[in-house]
Amino acid sequence: MHFDPNKFTVKAQEALQAASMLASSKQNQQIEPEHLLSVMLGDHDNIACQIARKLETPVDTLLSVVDREIDRIPKVTGASATGQYISSDLGKVFDTALKEAEQLKDEYISSEHLFIAMSEAGVKVSKLLKDAGIDRNAILKVLTSFRGSQRVTSQNAEESYQSLKKYSRNLNDLVIKGKLDPVIGRDDEIRRVLQILSRRTKNNPVLIGEPGVGKTAIVEGIAQRIVGGDVPENLKSKQIAALDIAALVAGTKFRGEFEERLKALVKEVQASDGEVILFIDELHLLVGAGSAEGSMDAANILKPALARGELRCIGATTLDEYRKHIEKDAALERRFQTVIVDQPSVEDTVSILRGLKEKYEIHHGVRIKDAALVAAAELSNRYIADRFLPDKAIDLIDEACSRLRLEIDSEPEELDRINRELRRLEIEREALKRELEATGSV
């Protein structure tokens, strides 16, 4: 096969470039499959490395074996060491990769095609891979968990593999790992959200409330209930994925890249047959996210999937942002069912603080009295007018614990102030003494 860079995906081109640089650094005139395999296994983001790890292959051991093979390749120095070329073995790998791409109905040669080709082309690295338990069937079996039913139809196709994993956080996993704070109260709102999620159509709740009233906490509470099995039968197997819009937009330099990522993510959610519920915090960011002049924004990509009921979604935004962005877009607004989240009463805030007390005690290493929790709820409600419960009460407790810990670990503030004043006066006294000595000597 004549080497044509335009037939390769961006990631595959990067791997080939890295292989060329590795060959140069080792003073090898020919670029061999060993160079390519070494750079692919050494890059944790490369799908070849991820497939090998999924197959439970000791990647570091395999990498050291490949590097030993590279050291055996003849070195060329002096006047004859001009120019680099692709070896006949690597040419065979390219031919096999092209056949693999055609067989998988892909339009470009990507990293996984090269990886399969290296195990199949009958070159030296094929034996190394087979000895490590990596062959075509094993790779293809694992590949579906990365690609699903996706095909390589663009040069950036590898960017869209496992989109859900890259651009969202699985709240169910965080609950199992104990990374989320317990959610106390909010039973009415949680029940209303579960009721909307159980509907056949228009099953997309949007939580509307002021900043700090606990909209995200409600969704975390639902994830905790799903993990605990305390939900209707039709929601017991569901996973909640919190979308990271910043990660989705980051690095999209060229027009169409953002849309491609989002479409891949939506396709992955659709392929789960309703098992994944997407949580979009700051829902208003979707209106206009990724849009440049003449291109679609994220909301327009989501609308068809929401309308057909193929995408189940929970949104969260403030009342002002909802009115400014979402209410104006009637087509988007009618896809969602609103759930108003008011700030809790002082009594409910005290209950929430009691539930969080243990987490803060462990973090700060101090004991929190119940009277302090009641005082935090009452005083924050009375004196902090521009913030909302329970957020401002939680902040008060956190701030007080932090201050107490600081005083325990270091000198008390009063003593520290007196010591600093003493040091300042001592420096002043020394300066005056030197001045007096100087005038005395004159």
Swiss-Prot record:
Specify the superkingdom.
Bacteria
Keywords in alphabetical order: ATP-binding, Chaperone, Coiled coil, Cytoplasm, Nucleotide-binding, Repeat, Stress response
Q: Coiled-coil ranges per the record?
A: 394-442
Q: Which GO terms describe its molecular function?
A: ATP binding; ATP hydrolysis activity
Entries under Pfam families matching the protein: AAA, AAA_lid_9, Clp_N
UniProt domain Clp R: residue ranges: 5-149
Cited PANTHER family: ATP-DEPENDENT CLP PROTEASE (PTHR11638), HEAT SHOCK PROTEIN 104 (PTHR11638:SF18)
The entry's function note states:
Part of a stress-induced multi-chaperone system, it is involved in the recovery of the cell from heat-induced damage, in cooperation with DnaK, DnaJ and GrpE. Acts before DnaK, in the processing of protein aggregates. Protein binding stimulates the ATPase activity; ATP hydrolysis unfolds the denatured protein aggregates, which probably helps expose new hydrophobic binding sites on the surface of ClpB-bound aggregates, contributing to the solubilization and refolding of denatured protein aggregates by DnaK.
User: What is known about its subunit structure?
Assistant: Homohexamer. The oligomerization is ATP-dependent.
Q: What is this protein called?
A: Probable chaperone protein ClpB 2
Species the sequence originates in = Chlorobaculum tepidum (strain ATCC 49652 / DSM 12025 / NBRC 103806 / TLS)
Gene this protein is translated from: clpB2
